[in-house]
A protein has these predicted regions:
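A short helix-breaking turn/cap at a secondary-structure junction
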Residues: 99-180, 199
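Short glycine-biased active-site loop of nucleotidyltransferases that positions the nucleotide triphosphate
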Residues: 87-90, 154-157, 208-211
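Short helix-loop-beta junction
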Residues: 178-190
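Charged, often glycine-rich, active-site loop that binds/positions anionic groups
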Residues: 42, 46, 205-216
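Short glycine/serine-rich loop segments
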Residues: 10-12, 16-135
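N-terminal, positively charged, Ser/Thr/Ala/Gly-biased leader segments
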Residues: 1-6
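General small-molecule cofactor/ligand-binding pocket signal
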Residues: 26, 191-196
Length: 216
């Protein structure tokens, strides 16, 4: 309630980039409070529903953006990712959610008390083609953190990648889907290696402390 109806006084660097591309901003979409969770159930607006099945969540924290794109209301929506907030909603809603390299798009103005900015600014769309077109355009916008331009992506790259496949703790259906995707990539000549990444609950506790500090 403390931030209900709060209107930003200025555009972030990334929003300025978006406006410079000519995209039209239709408004805000729902997120969980301060983007802290992987589902979108804001206390003010109530839970956001998955367009494919209203009994399910669209994921989070960019769940409102993903729901708008998946339902066809918009073709592209802003999302950002510090711990899955682009990738989780994209997965839940059957969308393309690419977490770009930090600095590929403009970094937002973070909290002054935090020494690092862990957010990656991006979008969710319904196709790889739309996502590629967005990044081709956005990388031409002014950005003091800009990386060397990639340009228009019209075909698969020739380089073969080394890809680690991690399915620790995954639901069986999710694990099978990931393994199927890995098989497809292996068929394209990429090297796939299944690995295990031990995860300590302390990591999650530390992350929530960091993220909560960023919120203020």
């Amino acid at each position: 309630s403390a931030v209900n109806l709060n209107k930003a006084r200025k555009d972030s660097s990334f929003v300025k980039q978006i406006k410079q591309t000519g995209l039209i901003n239709l408004g805000k979409s729902t997120t969980p409070e301060f983007g802290l969770t992987g589902t979108t159930e804001a206390l003010i607006q109530g839970p956001t529903r998955n367009p494919w099945n209203k009994d399910f969540s669209p994921g989070g924290s960019s769940g409102g953006a993903a729901a708008l794109v998946a339902s066809g209301i918009v073709s592209i929506a802003h999302a950002n990712d510090g711990a899955g907030s682009i990738r989780i909603p994209a997965s839940c809603c059957g969308l393309v959610g690419l977490k770009p390299t930090r600095g590929r798009t403009a970094l937002v103005d973070g909290s002054k008390i935090m020494p690092i900015n862990i957010l990656h600014q991006g979008v969710v769309t319904r196709s790889v083609r739309d996502t590629a077109a967005f990044y081709e355009t956005i990388e031409t916008m002014p950005n003091k953190h800009s990386l060397p331009p990639i340009g228009k992506v019209i075909s698969p790259g020739k380089a073969r990648l080394r890809i680690a496949l991690v399915t620790d703790g995954a639901d069986q259906e999710c694990r099978l889907a990931a393994e199927h995707a890995a098989q497809l990539m292996a068929g394209e000549g990429h090297h796939i290696e299944a690995i295990s990444l031990p995860f300590s609950p302390q990591v999650l506790d530390d992350f929530f402390i960091l993220w909560s500090c960023m919120a203020f």
